[in-house]
């Protein structure tokens, strides 16, 4: 059958590193250990001296990163990686994470495992208010909710947005100032921090 999975599929895998000059390489290795959680696509965002850089694509991690030279542009003190198994949104390049958002005041990378059960209604509400979405993934909804809080301290923006989403989720966000992790109130999605 043409669309049968080749093996074990779970959800997604998310891996982040902060404060290590080999962050992109460590993230790449970490994603190898999580490959069983997602085989549709992979990506890494590196926080470099020149800002955030991203390499991503459809397929297995080994198909997206065919040689270690592809990690060179991502070298910096922090990185965020993701292997995708879609539960919301299509199997298209625009949905491969981490999603990278560049704003006039900052850049934010966002990776997510789980499902937002109110994503459709939130997306409609945000679109009615003028939001423009670049993907069909429910992940992008969180960033639009965060950016509605501009002017508030970063953690207030993040907490306010997280209080608006429902479902089982684990989010990791990378900014120039830190790596932030959040899980749903019931802890349905696995998250290890340390």
UniProtKB/Swiss-Prot annotation:
Group of enzyme by EC: transferase
PROSITE patterns in alphabetical order: GATASE_TYPE_2
Domain Glutamine amidotransferase type-2 as annotated: residue spans: 12-194
Keyword field: Glutamine amidotransferase, Glycosyltransferase, Purine biosynthesis, Transferase
Gene3D superfamilies: Glutamine Phosphoribosylpyrophosphate, subunit 1, domain 1 (3.60.20.10)
InterPro entries on file: GATase_2_dom, Ntn_hydrolases_N
SUPFAM superfamilies xrefs: N-terminal nucleophile aminohydrolases (Ntn hydrolases) (SSF56235)
Entry EC number(s): 2.4.2.14
Propeptide part(s) removed at maturation, as residue ranges: 1-11
Family: In the C-terminal section; belongs to the purine/pyrimidine phosphoribosyltransferase family.
Name the UniProt record assigns to this protein: Amidophosphoribosyltransferase
Source species of the chain: Lacticaseibacillus casei
């Amino acid at each position: 059958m043409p669309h049968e999975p080749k093996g074990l599929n779970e959800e997604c895998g998310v891996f982040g590193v902060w404060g290590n000059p080999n962050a992109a390489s460590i993230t790449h290795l970490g994603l190898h250990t999580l490959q069983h959680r997602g085989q549709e696509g992979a990506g890494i965002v590196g926080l470099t001296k020149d800002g955030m850089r991203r390499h991503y694509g459809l397929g297995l991690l080994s198909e997206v990163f065919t040689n270690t030279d592809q990690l060179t542009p991502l070298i910096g003190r922090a990185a965020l990686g993701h292997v995708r198994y879609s539960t919301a949104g299509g199997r298209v390049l625009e949905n491969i994470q981490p999603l990278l958002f560049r704003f006039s005041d900052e850049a934010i990378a966002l990776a997510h495992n789980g499902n937002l059960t109110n994503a459709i209604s939130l997306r409609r509400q945000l679109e009615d208010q003028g939001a423009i979405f670049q993907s069909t993934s429910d992940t992008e909804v969180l960033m639009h909710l965060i950016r509605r809080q501009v002017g508030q301290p970063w953690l207030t923006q993040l907490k306010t947005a997280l209080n608006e989403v429902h479902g089982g989720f684990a989010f990791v966000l990378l900014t120039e100032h830190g790596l932030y992790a959040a899980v749903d109130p019931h802890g349905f999605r696995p998250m290890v921090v340390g």
